[in-house]
């Protein structure tokens, strides 16, 4: 196991615990006398004006559109590294987690649609339970220490990375509405420039980030979700240069602590603060939150485990070393922790709709994710050997 992956897992796990704390603080503030301060903080107007460019948004949207673009930049860097020389490099390594991830996205979406498919508005949230919060899941897994085999951690990492890639595609295809062709054309020119820089072997990360900033503005103005700029830049930064450097890994190494310890916890703090005022039992047991919670807690493990089992039984893929199906099932339950990624998709799905839809969708996410975390931890604790003396 490379030092980079080992460090990645440590940062994600610790960041997951901070993320949980941030969410709890947000929930407390949103339902206490501090509620006014909490809302005022999120509504603080922030403006950037450069020549004719004027971007004015409340702080909440700067977090969701700006800081989350940095998160997706790191996702792009991770996916590229893993595809080229990591846990997803080559068919044999990639096929098992890829099939598992596919099942883990299809089943939750189908279960959600069983509850909400008949409603024209709420059916827009079909992708909410399809996401996995890797930081949260690894944070829960970290509670079991070195009892967890390295191969099981890498399986969760690979599955979650493919899941992230699927979420990126879903956002691009299904949650983009009005499009400005002029801004999109400028974005295409920026992408072409990034591709040319990669082809010419430009190794200066700052050059990619500068063009990436222009790309972010163009995509933001185009109507496509601006976080996609981060993924594109991540894929364009070279993994290796002729002088044996790795601009991609250096940037990933530098950004990871900021993402794990600041950006994702701040996103959780900004988005998990659901006010329970006006929330009713009938609303909490309505089809929207039930569909989301069922998709996360039932659909995720059902899809991941069933697709994994079929892939092995049909000879399409092999079970990774030192892993059994009991452990796969426990991890598949942990993957039902959608949390930040599910909240992010919910904010896109119900943008401009009745605020109650966002409120109840967040409650469904919290219910499903918390249940998946508790049950997944308990099942994994039972599925693992009592003590591991071998360190990796």
Swiss-Prot record:
Transmembrane segments: 14-34, 59-79, 95-115, 125-145, 154-174, 179-199, 213-233, 254-274, 287-307, 328-348, 363-383
Keyword Cell membrane: yes
Pfam family, one: Na_H_antiport_1
Domain of life according to the entry: Bacteria
UniProt catalytic activity: Na(+)(in) + 2 H(+)(out) = Na(+)(out) + 2 H(+)(in)
Membrane topology qualifier: Multi-pass membrane protein
GO molecular function: sodium:proton antiporter activity
GO cellular component terms attached to this protein's record: plasma membrane
Keyword terms of this UniProt record: Antiport, Cell inner membrane, Cell membrane, Ion transport, Membrane, Sodium, Sodium transport, Transmembrane, Transmembrane helix, Transport
Positions of disulphide bridges: none
GO aspect biological process, one term: regulation of pH
Subcellular location: Cell inner membrane
Protein family according to the UniProt entry: Belongs to the NhaA Na(+)/H(+) (TC 2.A.33) antiporter family.
NCBIfam families: NhaA (TIGR00773), PRK09560.1 (NF007111), PRK09561.1 (NF007112)
Biological role: Na(+)/H(+) antiporter that extrudes sodium in exchange for external protons.
HAMAP family named among the record's database cross-references: NhaA
Protein name as annotated: Na(+)/H(+) antiporter NhaA
Biological source species: Yersinia enterocolitica serotype O:8 / biotype 1B (strain NCTC 13174 / 8081)
């Amino acid at each position: 196991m490379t030092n980079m992956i080992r460090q990645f897992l440590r940062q994600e796990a610790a960041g997951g615990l901070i993320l949980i704390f941030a969410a709890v603080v947000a929930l407390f503030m949103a339902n206490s006398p501090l509620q006014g301060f909490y809302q005022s903080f999120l509504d603080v107007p922030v403006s950037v004006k450069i020549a004719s460019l004027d971007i004015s948004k409340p702080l909440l949207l700067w977090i969701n559109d700006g800081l989350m673009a940095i998160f997706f930049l790191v996702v792009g860097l991770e996916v590229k590294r893993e595809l080229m020389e990591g846990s997803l490099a080559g068919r044999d390594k990639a096929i098992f987690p890829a099939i598992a991830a596919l099942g883990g996205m299809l089943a939750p979406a189908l279960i959600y649609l069983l509850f909400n498919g008949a409603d024209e508005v709420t059916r827009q949230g079909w992708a909410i339970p399809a996401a996995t919060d890797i930081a949260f899941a690894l944070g829960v897994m970290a509670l079991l220490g070195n009892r967890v085999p390295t191969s099981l951690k890498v399986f969760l990492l690979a599955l979650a990375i493919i899941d992230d890639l699927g979420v990126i595609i879903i956002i691009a295809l299904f949650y983009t509405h009005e499009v400005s062709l002029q801004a999109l054309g400028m974005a295409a020119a920026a992408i072409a420039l990034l591709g040319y820089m990669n082809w010419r072997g430009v190794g200066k990360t700052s050059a990619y980030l500068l063009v990436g900033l222009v790309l972010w503005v163009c995509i933001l103005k185009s109507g496509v979700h601006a976080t996609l700029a981060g993924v594109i830049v991540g894929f364009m930064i070279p993994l290796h240069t002729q002088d044996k450097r790795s601009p991609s890994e250096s940037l990933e190494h530098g950004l990871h602590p900021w993402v794990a310890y600041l950006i994702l916890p701040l996103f959780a703090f900004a988005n998990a603060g659901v006010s329970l005022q006006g929330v009713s039992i009938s609303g909490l047991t309505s089809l929207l939150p039930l569909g989301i919670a069922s998709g996360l807690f039932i659909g995720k493990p059902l899809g991941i485990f069933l697709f994994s089992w079929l892939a092995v039984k049909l000879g399409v893929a092999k079970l990774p070393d030192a892993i059994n199906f009991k452990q796969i099932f426990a991890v598949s339950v942990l993957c039902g922790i959608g949390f930040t990624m599910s909240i992010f998709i919910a904010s896109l799905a119900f943008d401009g709709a009745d605020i109650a839809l966002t409120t109840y969708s967040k409650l469904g996410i919290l219910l499903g994710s918390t249940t998946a975390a508790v049950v997944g931890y308990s099942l994994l604790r039972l599925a693992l050997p009592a003590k591991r003396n071998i360190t990796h």
